[in-house]
Amino acid sequence: MRTSQYLLSTLKETPADAEVISHQLMLRAGMIRKLASGLYTWLPTGVRVLKKVENIVREEMNNAGAIEVSMPVVQPADLWQESGRWEQYGPELLRFVDRGERPFVLGPTHEEVITDLIRNELSSYKQLPLNFYQIQTKFRDEVRPRFGVMRSREFLMKDAYSFHTSQESLQETYDAMYAAYSKIFSRMGLDFRAVQADTGSIGGSASHEFQVLAQSGEDDVVFSDTSDYAANIELAEAIAPKEPRAAATQEMTLVDTPNAKTIAELVEQFNLPIKKTVKTLLVKAVEGSSFPLVALLVRGDHELNEVKAEKLPQVASPLTFATEEEIRAVVKAGPGSLGPVNMPIPVVIDRIVAAMSDFAAGANIDGKHYFGINWDRDVATPEVADIRNVVAGDPSPDGQGTLLIKRGIEVGHIFQLGTKYSEALKASVQGEDGRNQILTMGCYGIGVTRVVAAAIEQNYDERGIVWPDAIAPFQVAILPMNMHKSFRVQELAEKLYSELRAQGIEVLLDDRKERPGVMFADMELIGIPHTIVLGDRNLDNDDIEYKYRRNGEKQLIKTGDIVEYLVKQIKG
């Protein structure tokens, strides 16, 4: 490709509305342009990267035995009504009617469509297992699209769905998809972790996220410093302290705390160690409970894990925090004065709270706290559960090492769905025993456009993008200095361009009438891994300057050796 016949579209300045580095660099490198909120046009450089990602995904899915299909973006509403997700999905599901007033949706995912297809196409267990995938545009009407293509409304996704007659068969395919995803992200040169995850609104029994580690990530990824343990923070277990609870050394005292309505204020005003405080959060109880609310207690420096809390049998789903009005109606005190002593509703405490002694908490009286509280002396030990987020330094749940926490960008997610959708849509086949058998399903997604942004978040410097070789838009840039004035530079540039292309190498020849500084800046901005610079001064010595983008190292290579050298660098 020649720049004179290409839409390079680089920008010198960073657009003001671009928050994260990937969004900034994708705009500056001429990869994308914003059409409307959460909607982007992909320009040639962006498409080249996108296709590289797509091809790796497609190759590994095919290698894993998955079969490619293509399903409509527009889906009839009756399928979503049949599955029960028409009401559940919320405003992210874009709904519309056609000219015949028939309701449809723009597909954010395709569980319903693929299950409908399979219930009409398959009839016997002999046809299974099967795993279908597509790489296709999806639409989710995000309330606040942000971070460029990281959280856009329209995006490209690889979604796959497998069908089975047994849990054992599903587990085999799930393991194969786990391995395929690991190969996909390894081939792309990404630093990632596969982590245990919550199944969320998709449903099902088991789930793993594939997280690219990056400071701009929206998720907290937890992993052991010693073992292979890794989990999303929502699912990471906070194990109980091994040490027994210390004996009481203080009497429980009622203290006036009129200006301490938060843990931070309590700690500051009374010089308390934060690890000797407990905060109390009230949430709505499950429907049909004899109590309207449930009290959840965590240590003052810890955060409630809402996913864990929602799974408590006495807690309503979705988890809903009580309003001040609801709290006062039950406890007769405000949110800043709550605690376990004389709490008139069920109480669940975190494992580490159960191991505390001589701690401070609200007295359930406005402007008052109890100091020196001890379990079983001042208040009976209530139900104990793991309801907090882990923190860095906690022991790993597998007993090996301690936990580290880094930010991550979710680029892939695999689920064991079980029979959630097949039961709702009555997808079944004749089993080996001749009886009708509901199918067991798995689903497996990769955010293809998000992978591009995540790769940039992990691979950039002050000059621009530093692409991993496997997904770079071009492999080699040829920069001929003053080629329009120097015949030998022009002749050599054309010769190398032809020879490299003949070797199957993707080359960008910068044949613009531009200053050298502009040419260098553009090639570094778009992140081409290998650059060769042709100039009269070096050619006097039969040399060509070679530069590797990732480490910035330069070296002189003889003209006759440069093609062989580049082929070796790229193809190994």
UniProtKB/Swiss-Prot annotation:
Which reaction(s) does the protein catalyse, per the Swiss-Prot or TrEMBL entry?
A: tRNA(Pro) + L-proline + ATP = L-prolyl-tRNA(Pro) + AMP + diphosphate
Q: Which organism is it from?
A: Shigella dysenteriae serotype 1 (strain Sd197)
EC number(s) reported in the record: 6.1.1.15
UniProt free text on domains: Consists of three domains: the N-terminal catalytic domain, the editing domain and the C-terminal anticodon-binding domain.
User: Which top EC class is given?
Assistant: ligase
* Gene Ontology biological-process entries: prolyl-tRNA aminoacylation
**What name does UniProt use for this protein?**
Proline--tRNA ligase
| A single MF term (Gene Ontology) | ATP binding
Q: Which Pfam families match?
A: HGTP_anticodon, tRNA-synt_2b, tRNA_edit
Q: Which family does it belong to?
A: Belongs to the class-II aminoacyl-tRNA synthetase family. ProS type 1 subfamily.
GO terms under cellular component: cytosol
Q: Which domain of life is it from?
A: Bacteria
The UniProt keyword set, sorted, is: Aminoacyl-tRNA synthetase, ATP-binding, Cytoplasm, Ligase, Nucleotide-binding, Protein biosynthesis
Q: Keyword Ligase: yes or no? A: yes
Q: Where in the cell is it found?
A: Cytoplasm
Assembly: Homodimer.
| InterPro entries xrefs | aa-tRNA-synt_IIb, aa-tRNA-synth_II, aa-tRNA-synth_II/BPL/LPL, Anticodon-bd, Anticodon-bd_dom_sf, Pro-tRNA-ligase_IIa, Pro-tRNA-synth_IIa_bac-type, Pro-tRNA-Synthase_IIa_type1
